[in-house]
Amino acid sequence: FLQAASGGRIGSSNTGIIEVEALKKIDFTLTEGNRLALIGHNGSGKTTLLRVLAGAYKPTSGKYECIGRVTSLIDPMMGMDGELTGLENIKLRGLFLGLSKNEIKNITEDVIEFSELGDFIKVPVRTYSSGMVLRLGFSISTAINPEILLMDEWMSVGDSDFKRKAEMRLNSFISKAGIMVMATHDDELAKSVCNKFIRLEHGEIV
């Protein structure tokens, strides 16, 4: 393998396929009340590690054990379908987040009200502006009480008015999480929000 300047290590397999070893020798344990910051430059492996924790990527070696429901703010629009209406996407993303039908029903009115989409909630998401889609995804993701919360950088959503109430909702959402893992390149933000820290370089803890 060759060390990659962009992070991780790259090489080729016996079949000639390019492979990237994005993470190596990652070892840590988190318990209730932990707020972990994954700190590192772009390409250091932060987002890849978050995606492993979210279950989106499976590790090729080692063991990952998670007890509790994981809520991800890595991509608040993940699991949404542009051909479906906003209302249908509340149900779809709710299922993607592991919610029951009753839980989805209970959060629907809150999502509609907080997202401020009005009648647009009844039309296909492909007709939305990027800001509207982000507001919907954010409103769905933050409508539940997270047991384990994963965040890729600190989120900023919408125009100035919406951003203010989104910031308040996000702070409340984070405070309810039993465990939080946040990827960031901002040391000061990490110190203000987290109580545990891991620095990554080229996919390894340093």
Please annotate each region the language model reported.
Residues F1-E21:
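Pre-NBD coupling/linker segments of ABC/ABC-like ATPases
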Residues I39-H41:
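The feature captures the beta-strand-to-loop junction immediately N-terminal to the Walker
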Residues K101, K105, V111-T127:
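Conserved ABC nucleotide-binding domain
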Residues T184-H185:
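H-loop/switch region of ABC-family ATPase nucleotide-binding domains
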Residues S192-R199:
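Conserved catalytic segment of ABC-fold P-loop ATPases
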